[in-house]
């Protein structure tokens, strides 16, 4: 059995996985009064998926993961406020800014050991948090960004106070990002990263 066959078998869905996703998407309909909470759960779950991709599969320890999450959130909000309120375009812009930030931080983070990465990522997170609080003319500071109005998704689905559209939007983004992360993990590159992580662990055990 070659490597590609092994990766393909590992990427196949378990029987219970589609059921879990169907239950997640049914939740805003079954529990409409809790749609806002479901939206928050989907957002935190997306954060967990991205952190698991970095820590669980590649073994890179990070204490500043929230910095990239916050960069994306502020980028999308500022884009909607000053340029265009379309949530999909804003999401693409947020992904771009977070990617640029990650690429810049990687120049420092990837040069150190685990302890160095911990301190550097923690420092990056604290610096960006302090900037978000101090640059109140841009970010709103501790009061948060005001006056952000998101347009309808695909020009059809308006965001409202009940949070149903937001819940479905966040769940859809979560599912798409989960599929991308899953595909990456079970790709040859993902297999290489996992192999490197295991090799480092075995080497530490032998010392």
Each language-model region and where it sits:
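Transmembrane alpha-helices and adjacent helix-loop boundaries
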Residues: 1-207
């Amino acid at each position: 059995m070659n490597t590609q066959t092994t990766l393909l078998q590992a990427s196949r869905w378990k029987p219970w996985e589609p059921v879990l996703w169907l239950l997640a998407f049914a939740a805003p309909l079954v529990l409409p009064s809790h749609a806002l909470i479901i939206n928050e759960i989907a957002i935190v779950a997306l954060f967990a998926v991205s952190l698991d991709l970095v820590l669980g599969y590649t073994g890179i320890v990070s204490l500043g993961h929230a910095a990239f999450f916050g960069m994306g959130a502020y980028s999308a909000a500022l884009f909607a406020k000053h340029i265009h309120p379309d949530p999909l375009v804003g999401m693409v812009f947020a992904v771009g800014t977070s990617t640029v930030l990650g690429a810049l931080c990687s120049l420092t983070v990837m040069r150190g050991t685990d302890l160095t990465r911990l301190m550097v990522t923690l420092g990056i997170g604290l610096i960006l948090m302090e900037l978000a609080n101090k640059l109140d003319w841009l970010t709103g500071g501790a009061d948060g960004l005001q006056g952000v109005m998101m347009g309808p998704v695909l020009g059809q689905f308006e965001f409202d106070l009940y949070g149903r559209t937001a819940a479905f939007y966040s769940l859809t983004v979560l599912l798409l990002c989960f599929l991308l992360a899953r595909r990456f993990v079970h790709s040859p590159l993902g297999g290489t990263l996992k192999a490197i992580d295991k090799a480092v662990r075995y080497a530490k055990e032998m010392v």
